């Protein structure tokens, strides 16, 4: 989350899509209810099913699974055409005014510029080099006026842009310069400054080419060309406007199935917070895995971020783009590098070309890219400090400046090692073994049949879990005969683990809060806590290297393991190690008179060094366990601001700030957009930023410095346009159909799917079509009464919901003669799922591009091991036997939502 659970109570407007918090996050859902009760906030819910969350909505819209970008793109188009945008914010806090390189092409045919048939060359996905190319005398703000008097659903707001392009004309400018302020707060600094970049002369020639020789990798220009009037046809804003002019209410209806009048109600309601230029109100967007689990999931979230940027909702109390994490510690697992392509703190993994630490730092450390008159904190410029400190935490005294802090010990990945690709390589015989800790890979899927067959080809499998589950017992999957079992040569080791109540440690919630938890009961029998199991394995492996040698043992032998109890490290010790400590006496220019002595805990990541004098396991968590104690254990209930900040409860990364990018909660002069929800502000007397929250900003940067509020971006501003390699599939989001779809993409039928989505090609990776009889859209979901695949082993949960079912529309059931409770067989091109029919009016038929289309929903919580499974009272069919192994090219998440099935009576 950019904000946090409690902050939702501060909002005036909520859009919940891709999530069902009333059922899946019932404790957290109290905060949307608080906002409705105490702020009269409005709630819009968009979902394939009418859920418990939808019962609380002021407006509910049923959407076809996998069409969220079309809906959100329609909202962007509506906001622009009706002049409901945050004008000052847009110009000064986003890259809307930046000029994009000549040669960049929007995907009117489904492809951005640079596509070679397999991937994108991204040279044109960049900014133009230069200076101010707009009018030399510009006002602080730019007012928005529609390009024509037509309604948002009329031809001239969408088709005209395309006609202009066909005729070779420049798109009509959507902005006109105005001299009057557009918000109730002053929009220019009180002292010595204009709006960012105002009035400066143009810089060097736009688009100047480099000299001959080998073409270097494209980089962001140091001095970006810009136009504060936003009239330049290649300004990010004009390209944004052109991109989403195609997303008319008519097109939204064709793709999503949402009737135009209902879409316009949602668009009118959500953008009403910016009616008449008002900047006091804030709106939030809340989502969960219903957005992430698509072959374009990252771009769905990007579309929401763009919408929030043009509405000025990011960095503000009651605003943001807020992810509801699906497990209690998914956030912490990601923060600590629990995926293949990052280290803790979101540091990048080295590549084979990173021959030394300096080369790695040069590749991964961004340099500022902005108009020369603006300023950018560019906090990722500290990457060398973060990386050196991380290496010191790994290798201790053996990591020195002279040996690059043992950088050469790190693995250099030469291809993708995502979850789905790992299983694909196991199926092809390349991966020989798997350690599965608290992870039921067969049930999780996708394409569970392929995962089962992959495990049959492995040499060994180690499973640490609480119960017998599908992965540990893949060999007894339904359909496996005794003779086939005998032919399986995989050795399976089962290790009894400890449940969450049987071990201490931390949870990091969706709001980025680190909170310490204590042991309630000891693990039963031979069960052991995770760190003891991992420690025993590591120490035995190290012993084998010490006694028997082996290929390149140095990384294992040099690893620092200086815990008081090596066989069972204290997690308090580990937490302190992650926070970091000084390895020599430290001082900071910004904190004169303060010295951190060697051996002391670091007070925060500002103290990290690149010279080997600091050690830190995760720079984001630095400050969580200081000399003052375990900040994550704090339970202070003081909330002086009333905004739900609770600064003395736990620890929120980074730096205990609760709302990220909170400089954007103020105007250019440093005054809050809304004085009733004051987060941070500029204090002229003190010469620094102060507030109820920790300023997410360079604390002494004056408003007149024109420093952008988005300090983690090289540009210093929010990215409406995502340049270069920021995204694999386009600098703007575009609607693509799921890999299995009932229709061709109405925007560009010749390019229906994401052209760079990863699709697998083994004999078990089959895709279905409507012509093959797979004519129903299926989505998966979770129930309040169950927790993934654990609780099917708990009698109380099983009593509440004992067996799998299929949520089927009443109209479809009537057409097929299906009655409630009747057993159904749901088939995809990959497998079958057996469950009883739950005939419901919560899912209705939809008109998709003129064709009547049905959707169904199935919960994910069952398989072939569990209480009811062992009693043979279920179909023994995991839901992910149905789902396809096709993944998002950015986050590598499989497409568990929106695939095609057919329905038969079992």
Q: Where is each model-derived feature located?
A:
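Extended redox/cofactor-interaction regions of prokaryotic respiratory oxidoreductases
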Residues: 1-34, 39-41, 145, 149-163, ...
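A glycine-rich phosphate-binding loop feature that marks nucleotide/adenosyl-phosphate handling sites
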Residues: 92-96, 269-270, 288-290, 320-331, ...
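Long, well-ordered, tryptophan-enriched scaffold segments
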Residues: 54-55, 59-277, 366, 374, ...
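Glycine/threonine-rich phosphate-binding loop and adjacent beta-strand/alpha-helix elements that clamp
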Residues: 5, 490-495, 500-523, 860, ...
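Long, contiguous, secondary-structure-rich segments that constitute the structural scaffold
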Residues: 532-586, 690-695, 699-702, 710-716, ...
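Phosphate/diphosphate-binding loops
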Residues: 463-469, 473-476, 484, 522-538, ...
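Short, polar loop motifs at secondary-structure junctions
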Residues: 46-52, 466-469
């Amino acid at each position: 989350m950019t904000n946090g659970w409690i902050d939702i109570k501060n909002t005036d407007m909520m859009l919940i899509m891709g999530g069902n918090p009333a059922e899946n996050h019932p404790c957290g859902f109290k905060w949307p209810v608080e906002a409705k009760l105490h702020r009269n906030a409005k709630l819009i819910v968009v979902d394939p099913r009418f859920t418990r969350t939808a019962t609380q909505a002021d407006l509910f819209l049923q959407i076809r699974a996998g069409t969220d970008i079309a809906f959100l793109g329609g909202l962007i188009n509506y906001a622009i055409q009706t002049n409901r945008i945050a004008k000052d914010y847009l110009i000064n806090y986003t890259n809307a005014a930046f000029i994009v390189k000549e040669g960049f092409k929007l995907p009117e045919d489904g492809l951005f510029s640079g596509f070679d048939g397999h991937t994108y060359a991204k040279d044109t996905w960049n900014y133009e080099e230069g200076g101010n190319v707009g009018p030399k005398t510009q006002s602080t703000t730019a007012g928005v006026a529609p390009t024509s008097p037509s309604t948002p659903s009329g031809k001239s707001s969408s088709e005209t842009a395309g006609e202009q392009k066909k005729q070779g004309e420049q798109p009509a400018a959507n902005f006109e310069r105005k001299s009057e302020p557009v918000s109730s707060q002053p929009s220019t600094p009180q002292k010595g400054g204009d709006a960012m970049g105002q009035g400066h002369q143009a810089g060097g020639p736009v688009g100047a080419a480099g000299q001959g020789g080998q073409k270097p990798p494209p980089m962001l220009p140091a001095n970006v060309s810009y136009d504060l009037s936003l009239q330049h046809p290649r300004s990010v804003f004009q390209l944004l406007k052109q991109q989403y002019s195609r997303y008319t209410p008519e097109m939204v209806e064709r793709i999503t199935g949402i009737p135009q009048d209902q879409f316009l109600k949602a668009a009118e309601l959500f953008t009403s917070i910016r009616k008449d230029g008002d900047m006091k109100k804030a709106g939030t967007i809340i989502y969960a895995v219903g957005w992430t689990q698509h072959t374009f999931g990252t771009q769905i979230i990007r579309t929401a971020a763009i919408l929030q940027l043009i509405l000025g909702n990011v960095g503000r109390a009651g605003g943001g783009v807020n992810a509801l994490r699906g497990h209690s510690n998914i956030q912490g697992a990601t923060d600590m590098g629990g995926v293949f392509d990052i280290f803790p703190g979101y540091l990048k993994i080295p590549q084979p070309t990173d021959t030394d630490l300096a080369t790695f730092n040069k590749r991964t450390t961004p340099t500022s890219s902005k108009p020369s008159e603006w300023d950018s904190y560019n906090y990722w410029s500290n990457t060398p400090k973060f990386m050196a400190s991380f290496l010191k935490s790994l290798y201790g005294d053996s990591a020195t400046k002279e040996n690059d802090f043992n950088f050469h010990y790190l693995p250099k990945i030469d291809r993708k090692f995502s979850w789905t690709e790992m299983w694909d390589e196991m199926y092809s015989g390349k991966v020989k073994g798997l350690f599965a800790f608290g992870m039921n890979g067969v049930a999780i899927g996708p394409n569970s049949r392929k995962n089962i067959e992959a495990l049959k080809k492995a040499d060994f499998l180690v499973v640490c879990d609480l119960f017998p589950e599908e992965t540990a017992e893949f060999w007894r999957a339904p359909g496996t005969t005794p003779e086939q079992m005998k032919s399986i040569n995989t050795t399976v080791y089962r290790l009894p683990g400890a449940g969450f109540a049987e071990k201490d440690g931390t949870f990091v919630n969706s709001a980025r809060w680190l909170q310490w938890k204590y042991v309630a009961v000891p693990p039963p029998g031979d069960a052991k806590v995770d760190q003891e199991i991992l420690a025993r394995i590591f120490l035995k492996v190290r012993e084998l290297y010490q006694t028997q040698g082996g290929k390149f043992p140095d990384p294992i032998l040099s690893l620092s393991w200086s815990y008081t109890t090596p066989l069972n490290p204290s997690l308090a010790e580990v937490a302190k190690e992650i926070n970091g400590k000084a390895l020599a006496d430290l001082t900071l220019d910004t904190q004169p008179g303060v010295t951190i002595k060697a051996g002391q805990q670091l007070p925060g990541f500002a103290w990290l060094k690149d010279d080997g004098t600091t050690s830190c396991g995760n720079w984001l968590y630095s400050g969580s366990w200081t000399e003052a104690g375990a900040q994550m254990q704090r339970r202070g209930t003081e909330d002086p601001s009333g905004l739900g900040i609770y600064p003395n409860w736990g620890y929120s990364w980074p730096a205990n700030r609760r709302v990220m990018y909170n400089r954007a909660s103020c105007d250019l002069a440093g005054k809050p957009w809304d004085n009733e929800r004051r987060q941070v502000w500029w204090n002229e007397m003190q010469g620094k930023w102060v507030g109820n929250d920790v300023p997410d900003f360079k604390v002494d940067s004056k408003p007149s410095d024109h420093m952008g509020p988005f300090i983690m971006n090289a540009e210093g501003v929010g990215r409406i346009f995502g340049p270069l390699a920021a995204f694999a599939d386009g600098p703007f989001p575009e609607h693509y159909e799921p890999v299995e779809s009932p229709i061709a993409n109405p925007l560009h039928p010749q390019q229906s799917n994401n052209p760079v989505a990863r699709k697998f090609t083994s004999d078990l990776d089959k895709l279905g079509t409507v012509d093959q009889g797979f004519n129903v859209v299926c989505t998966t979901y979770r129930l309040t009464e169950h927790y993934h695949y654990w609780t099917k082993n708990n009698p109380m949960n099983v009593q509440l919901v004992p067996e799998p079912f299929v949520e089927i529309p009443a109209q479809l059931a009537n057409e097929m003669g299906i009655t409630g409770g009747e057993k159904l067989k749901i088939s995809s091109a990959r497998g079958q799922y057996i469950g009883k029919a739950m005939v419901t009016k919560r899912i209705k038929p939809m008109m998709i591009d003129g064709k009547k289309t049905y959707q169904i929903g199935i919960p994910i919580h069952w398989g072939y091991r569990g209480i009811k499974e062992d009693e043979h009272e279920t179909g023994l069919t995991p839901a992910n036997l149905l789902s396809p192994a096709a993944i998002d090219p950015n986050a590598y998440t499989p497409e568990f939502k929106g695939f095609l099935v057919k329905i038969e009576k079992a």
